[in-house]
């Protein structure tokens, strides 16, 4: 039986589906709506040291700056569900500064955004396995909260090299795309396989129904971040997905039938 309330990096989630960073998760009002929805966690917009407010300036990094979220975190935590703070920076020092502040403010898990193109340009995290390992190891040793690393959909490194770099740095969680990466496996499945199941993998993208969520979870993915469906439907999408996922599970179990009936 699938666990729809997984424990990831020692954190218990009341539901395995949550928003993706940036999906209605920038303002206080948006984040409180997520906190009081059926989402299994509150995932913030990617947070930088200072505000990025010009939509043309920094792609997906527009946000009010880390102090805004440091002040907001205690209020978000009252909803009694995990808060995942997504963090981005153009230097390792920037990432550490923001991650430390948000961890001290009570974030349960820090998501390191290595997905954004501007982060690639400045940090070059995937120029080599050694560079990736250096970045995540330095951050991990400086931040008290457990870390998750969010990968871009296309990575020039091999999946075994990525998995090894994360594991060597004691990173417990990888956030990977659910879309196919090598013609057969999704990136999420490939990283899970490359780590021999030692990484907790959260899949992101490609899920808009309970049946689609079930298909991903059955492959060993611990939880799923929802993006487009949240933007399209609002936070009420989680109540729908929870119902559909329960129905899909019930249907799957009923079609198995009692032992010996096949």
Task: Identify the meaning behind each predicted range.
Residues 55-63, 117-130, 157-197, 233, ...:
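Glycine/Thr-rich beta-alpha phosphate-binding loop at enzyme active sites
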Residues 55-129:
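Active-site beta->alpha loop and helix N-cap motifs at the rims of alpha/beta catalytic domains
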Residues 60-81, 127-149, 181-202, 241-254:
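Alpha-helix-loop-beta-strand connector modules within alpha/beta enzyme cores
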Residues 44-49, 111-118, 173-182, 206-207, ...:
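Glycine-rich phosphate-binding active-site loops on the catalytic face of alpha/beta enzymes
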Residues 15-21, 40-45, 83-87, 110-112, ...:
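Hydrophobic faces of well-ordered beta-strands that scaffold small-molecule active sites
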Residues 29-34, 93-104, 155-169, 191-197, ...:
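Catalytic cores of alpha/beta
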Residues 1-83, 89, 241:
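N-terminal capping/small domains of soluble enzymes
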């Amino acid at each position: 039986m699938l666990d729809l309330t997984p424990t990831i990096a020692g954190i218990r989630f009341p539901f395995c589906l949550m928003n993706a960073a940036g999906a209605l998760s920038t303002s206080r009002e948006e984040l409180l709506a997520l906190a009081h929805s059926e989402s299994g966690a509150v995932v913030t917009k990617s947070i930088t040291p200072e505000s990025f407010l010009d939509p043309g300036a920094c792609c997906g990094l527009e946000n009010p700056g880390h102090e805004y979220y440091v002040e907001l975190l205690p209020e978000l935590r009252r909803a009694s569900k995990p808060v995942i703070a997504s963090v981005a920076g153009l230097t390792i020092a920037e990432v550490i500064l923001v991650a430390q502040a948000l961890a001290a403010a009570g974030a349960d898990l820090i998501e390191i955004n290595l997905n954004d193109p501007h982060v690639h340009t400045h940090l070059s995290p995937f120029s080599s396995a050694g560079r990736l390992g250096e970045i995540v190891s330095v951050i991990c040793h400086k931040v008290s909260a457990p870390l998750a690393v969010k990968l871009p959909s296309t990575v020039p490194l091999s999946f075994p090299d990525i998995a090894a770099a994360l594991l060597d740095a004691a990173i417990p969680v990888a956030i990977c795309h659910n879309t196919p990466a090598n013609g057969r496996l999704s990136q999420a499945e490939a990283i899970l396989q490359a780590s021999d199941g030692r990484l907790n993998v959260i899949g992101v993208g490609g899920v808009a129904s309970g049946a689609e969520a079930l298909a991903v979870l059955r492959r060993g993915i611990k939880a799923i971040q929802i993006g487009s469906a949240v933007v399209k439907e609002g936070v009420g999408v989680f109540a729908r997905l929870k119902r559909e996922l329960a129905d899909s599970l019930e249907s799957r179990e009923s079609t198995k039938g009692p032992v010996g009936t096949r």
